[in-house]
């Protein structure tokens, strides 16, 4: 699997698109808003920002969320500017980054014809992997990234023994768990090294990563949602609808870290100070437009399955082909509903606010 080419959320605006099924991601951005506001406020109140404010959203995806975070950041700065009595807005440079397969066209079609901020705002698309350099040195003042850094640059090497699974699970050999962790360490270190060159001294980063509280890498806190998809695929293997060999070669390029693991990589790389780190949670039932659940477990399970389909379909399509898609997601939906009827399932988020050290 060539992750750079295959990994992207389902584009367009159809029923199963990411644009129509990214409500939980929007709520996570809202949950982290106090941390993001505190970081941008501290940045703008100091002497790092003068006439230009460069903000990058890494892993912006498409749909309504692509502009949500940066819009909120600009609003915060404008409110603060007026309170501080500063006459002129900074010129805003906004960089929206994702892998080349992202639906950037949809983002730019959604832009307002005229800026609705007092200052000048320049918006740029930046296709490419954030596991590499994206910007010149000392370009950025603020980086935001939400629900992106759990994706790895590649499927870990040496996990051929992960048969019957598509991700980390309690049935995985220890070697598989170790391989996933090693890939996370390599990727996260590279991410931090690249950003250290691109962010100005005193600049800020707020990163929200799908993760876990537990130090158990195979904890259901982070792995259950993929285990249920593996069960749906294995049902189809047992019925002869999917080749077992093909199933055994499919693995999700993702690692959901604990706060301890994230902190360890930041301290090891050494270019950023940790201003704040915490874990939060959000229930699966929040995969609705209003985010309050409140429907039947069947409705909630259906919404979770659609949210996950918008994320996972491009990966499945590339490996298994189109013929299995409707069947596997129908089975997946039923398994999700069954699990949600028995327990309050939730996602764990690791949120970290960082300050670029002076060289």
UniProtKB/Swiss-Prot annotation:
Mg(2+) binds at residues 162, 248, 250-251. Substrate binds at residues 18, 21-25, 147-151, 255. InterPro entries: MeTrfase_7 (IPR005299), MeTrfase_capping (IPR042086), SAM-dependent_MTases_sf (IPR029063). Keywords: Magnesium, Metal-binding, Methyltransferase, S-adenosyl-L-methionine, Transferase. Its EC number is 2.1.1.274. It catalyses: salicylate + S-adenosyl-L-methionine = methyl salicylate + S-adenosyl-L-homocysteine. It is an enzyme of class 2 (transferase). It comes from the Eukaryota. GO terms for biological process: methylation. SUPFAM superfamilies: S-adenosyl-L-methionine-dependent methyltransferases. This is Salicylate carboxymethyltransferase.
């Amino acid at each position: 699997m060539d992750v750079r080419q295959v990994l992207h959320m389902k584009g367009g605006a159809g029923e199963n698109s990411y644009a129509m099924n990214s409500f939980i991601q929007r709520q996570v951005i809202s949950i982290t808003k106090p941390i993001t506001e505190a970081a941008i406020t501290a940045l703008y109140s100091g002497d790092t920002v003068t006439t230009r404010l460069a903000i990058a959203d890494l892993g912006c995806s498409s749909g309504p969320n692509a502009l949500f975070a940066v819009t909120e950041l600009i609003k915060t700065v404008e409110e603060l500017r007026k309170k501080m009595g500063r006459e002129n807005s900074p010129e805003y440079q906004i960089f929206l980054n994702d892998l080349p397969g992202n639906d950037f066209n949809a983002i730019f079609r959604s832009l307002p014809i005229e800026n609705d901020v007092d200052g000048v705002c320049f918006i740029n698309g930046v296709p490419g992997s954030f596991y590499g350099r994206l910007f010149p040195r000392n370009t950025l003042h603020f980086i935001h990234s939400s629900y992106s850094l759990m994706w790895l640059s590649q499927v870990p090497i040496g996990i051929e023994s992960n048969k019957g699974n598509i991700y980390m699970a309690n049935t995985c050999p220890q070697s598989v768990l170790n391989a996933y962790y090693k890939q996370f360490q390599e990727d996260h270190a590279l991410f931090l090294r690249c950003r250290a060159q691109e962010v100005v001294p005193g600049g800020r980063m707020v990163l929200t990563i799908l993760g876990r509280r537990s130090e158990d890498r195979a904890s259901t806190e982070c792995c259950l949602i993929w285990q249920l998809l593996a069960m749906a695929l294995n049902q189809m293997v047992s019925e002869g609808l999917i080749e077992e060999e093909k199933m055994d070669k499919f693995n999700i390029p993702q690692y959901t870290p604990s706060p301890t693991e994230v902190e360890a990589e930041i301290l090891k790389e050494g270019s950023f100070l940790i201003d704040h780190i915490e874990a939060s949670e959000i229930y699966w039932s929040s995969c609705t437009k209003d985010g309050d659940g409140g429907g039947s477990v069947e409705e909630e399970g259906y919404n979770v399955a659609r949210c996950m389909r918008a994320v996972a379909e491009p990966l499945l399509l590339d490996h298994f082909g189109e013929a299995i898609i409707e069947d596997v997601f129908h089975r997946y939906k039923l398994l999700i509903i069954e699990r949600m009827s028995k327990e309050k399932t939730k996602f764990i988020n690791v949120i970290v606010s960082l300050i670029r050290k002076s060289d």
